[in-house]
């Protein structure tokens, strides 16, 4: 549909320039207009990205991050293409989309829909997460990771489990300031959309992509879709925002500006599930024990903001105990809303038993016992039978 004030381009010989199909994700400019960026091109800025006029954005109440499909017309005098008609916004007609509630108008509730990650007997990582740190739709999860504790492998295993068990979820991975070879590895192993601003990109790229990807996920959740976002890492994202805001005159310890973490914390806080339908699950990594006071302060600022925390341990990794999860420090808030009663009772008994051990011994025992069973269901049945005999 074309607003009446947007007349089509006319070629030099007076003939109208033909319309072509086009689509992309809307990135807004502070002056009110926008451009359609290509997800297949990592949302990079290209001269061929269609221009969306401000009056069209206002008319259809378009928000940053929406997927727009319509008709595009090539501009004259070396101008880029312009959107002339809008056919669909997030799979809806423009009129339907204009009536949808915004992200902040929807009602957030506690996660209640358990996302099972167990696939087969191996890997044990996802089976242990199901027992000790269960994830639900709308979870705000933080993976706390010292260097070389298996963070990358854990993220890959989680992404593969989500793709296998929950194909209805829209899986997105955001990589900020990561090594280029790791970006390539993730793109080859993750069966979802991988958006990356690698360490050879500038700070502005890190900040721009972080905000655009979150807005994209919010728009999908508004439209009733269930989105699963893996973010690696929230620490490097916060570092980028610290450089981006500059020096406002007030600096915390470690060289972090007082306002630098406002936006990253707001982005992480967008994870939620809506009563009306739709959800955004965020699993983000936080780096610790890097020798940087800034990283430690960033972790302390984010600690407690999630409703699930999984802590990786260097001592376990050094002994090659995988997954290197510190059981005593890891858990999910309100897990009783996710787990069925039998599983919850078994998990409580398991935690009581393991809590009396050193955390290294506890994980060694758990992995050894769990590997004997083909599924968590069999393992839980054994715990339940031993409880009945007692």
Question: Predicted segment positions?
Answer:
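P-loop NTP-binding catalytic core
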Residues: 74-143
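Short, acidic/hydrophobic/Gly-rich beta-strand patch recurrent on exposed beta strands
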Residues: 34-39, 51, 85, 187
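Phosphate-interacting basic helix/loop segments used at nucleotide- and nucleic-acid interfaces
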Residues: 15-22, 124-128, 213-218
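Hydrophobic beta-strand signal
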Residues: 67-69, 142
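P-loop NTPase catalytic core
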Residues: 141, 149-150, 159-390
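Acidic low-complexity intrinsically disordered regions
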Residues: 1-46, 63, 71
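Beta-strand/loop nucleic-acid-binding surfaces
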Residues: 45-60
